[in-house]
Amino acid sequence: VREYAYLLDVTVRFEADQVQDERGTTKDGQKIYTLGDVYPHADMVTYPSSIEGFGNAFLEAVYYKRLILVNNYSIYEVDIKPKGFHTLWFDGFISNNTLNAVRNALKHPELTHEWAETNYQLAKRYFSYTILERRLESIVADCLGYQI
């Protein structure tokens, strides 16, 4: 990926050594950041893989109100996309249409901010802890035969 980015003259930063679960410093004194420190600086978050879990990383990008480019993997297609999230997506490979859509979105931050806010509200509606709690209570009640 590094070589490909270099060939295309695309600035990409790989910061795995400096992004951890907790803030701190490395042995040589460099700062260690968290994802919460990094997300606000991303122009776009990408999920190019064809196999993903439910979408915790997707929800993180929504929480931090970032533009999202996602491969149309099966769980996204079935469980996330139908909720109405505004994303840029592709089916298995990046086409010229995908590239043009990304360029257009990056040139119109007012549009991507609107999408991000809509996505945030949709996530609150469908995937918040309150919703999780209600659904778990219902499942437990079904198993036990009474409300807890």
Located regions from the model:
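A short hydrophobic beta-strand element within the catalytic core of glycosyltransferases
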Residues: 45-46
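Short hydrophobic beta-strand element within catalytic cores of glycosyltransferases
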Residues: 67-71, 87-88
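A charged, aromatic-enriched C-terminal amphipathic alpha-helix characteristic of glycosyltransferases
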Residues: 107-141
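Nucleotide-activated donor-binding/catalytic signature segment of Leloir-type glycosyltransferases, i.e.
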Residues: 1-37
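Short glycine/serine-rich donor-binding loops of glycosyltransferases
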Residues: 35, 55-58, 76
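Donor-sugar nucleotide-binding helix/loop cap in glycosyltransferases
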Residues: 61
